[in-house]
Amino acid sequence: MKEIKILEDYTTKTPLQLIGEMAGVCWGAKLDKDKNIARAIDCIKSGHGRVEELPDVYLVIEGFSAKALRELYTHIGGLPTRLQASTRYIDYEKGFDVVTPPSVENNNDAAEVWYKAISDIKMAMGALKALGIPKEDYTNLLPLAYQSKMIWKVNLRTLVNFMNLRTCFRAYWEIREFSNMLKKALMEYSPEWEIICKELFVPKCDAVGYCTEAKCCGRHKTKSEVIGEDAKQD
């Protein structure tokens, strides 16, 4: 079962108050809750991304495929920390769960091929173990579909970039599912996170007003189309 757990003891509960208070120090402004929140929103809307590096989120991610979790390693802004379940110490030869894509699940012939391949891998791992091959070697057979677990510590600025890219309709379906689940979890975590999620955790095309992808899904016009229209108006 896919699950995203926010570690409340470590995750910033009031990110807007934190941003506003720190920004207020820079400006020598009066510090209070309402002014801090207003100042934070103003900073974010003005594009001062540096202040978004202050709030941190700590997560336990479980039930997603190793393939999907690999995508998190490509988001390196703000030096995020990732700790993933070890393939050297967990007894995967006793069996492992996999994430099956809907395209396979909804195709009986494809599903038969898929599950046979997974079964063959499990049998091969058991056979290699019996032959004395160490766990750190026979677990190299694990497929990218196997379900893994991860701790992810990430700041708001990196999360905004992540959400802009991974809530896009062209993102891989499972990482898009993860993004939407995380957005929902943070919206329920605190009122300030709800504001942030609604305003910032959107596809990039919604944020900038046009599509930057080479293959556009049609949700927004492409950048060249928008620039062309602006040029005609000028």
Predicted regions and their residues:
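Family-specific signature for flavin-dependent thymidylate synthase
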Residues: 1-234
